[in-house]
């Protein structure tokens, strides 16, 4: 017994099926950052600001960036872009709540909307490193990424959900004790309500 899928608006159009028994469709796809930015200005860039995030000279782990979501909506972390002068590895923390970065770090500037005509703001508490060897003393490390010198996206952060009251942070450990400038930027968004 067969059935027919029609468009439901009374035009009489129905779905076509190819000889290989595949439904033929025409679709428009967008990514979540683009959609949130266009629909309400709710896609943002937030990070360590500027070219130099922190100068790391001791070869030890240094917490670089912390953010806590204070909005009623879930914050989605889409991607992280990192830049470092020497190789090393990053740790991504879930729910850090204490450490010298959180207690003594510099309050980061406001997250910048990707929609230049929007007045939307991200409701975040943020901190950036102001010294080498800043720390997170709690939180759970959920992933690591080893990176060569240069600029790279960290795609392992795709679709990380940060509910209200939750936080995230990132640290970097350079391979050696040579001074290394580091910058970290996150692309985040609040999903549009359906």
PLM features: residue spans?
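Beta-sandwich interaction modules
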Residues: 140-166
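Extended, low-complexity segments enriched in Ser/Thr/Gly and acidic residues that occur primarily
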Residues: 1-117, 123-133, 138-143, 172-183, ...
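Internal, hydrophobic beta-strand segments that form the core of beta-sheet-rich folds
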Residues: 162-176
């Amino acid at each position: 017994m067969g059935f027919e899928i029609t468009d439901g608006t009374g035009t009489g159009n129905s779905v076509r099926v190819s000889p290989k028994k595949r439904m033929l469709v025409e679709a428009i796809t967008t990514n979540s950052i683009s959609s949130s930015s266009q629909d309400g200005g709710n896609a943002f860039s937030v990070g360590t600001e500027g070219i130099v995030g922190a100068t790391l000279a001791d070869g030890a782990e240094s917490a670089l960036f912390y953010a806590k979501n204070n909005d009623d909506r879930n914050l989605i972390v889409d991607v992280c872009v990192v830049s470092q002068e020497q190789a090393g590895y990053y740790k991504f923390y879930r729910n850090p709540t204490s450490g010298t970065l959180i207690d003594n770090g510099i309050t980061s500037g406001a997250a910048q909307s990707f929609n230049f005509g929007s007045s939307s703001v991200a409701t975040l508490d943020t901190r950036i490193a102001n010294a080498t060897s800043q720390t997170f003393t709690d939180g759970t490390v959920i992933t690591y990424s080893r990176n060569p010198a240069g600029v790279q996206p960290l795609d392992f952060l795709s679709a990380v959900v940060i509910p209200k009251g939750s936080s995230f942070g990132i640290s970097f450990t350079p391979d050696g004790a040579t001074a290394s400038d580091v910058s970290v930027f996150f692309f985040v968004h609040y999903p549009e309500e359906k």
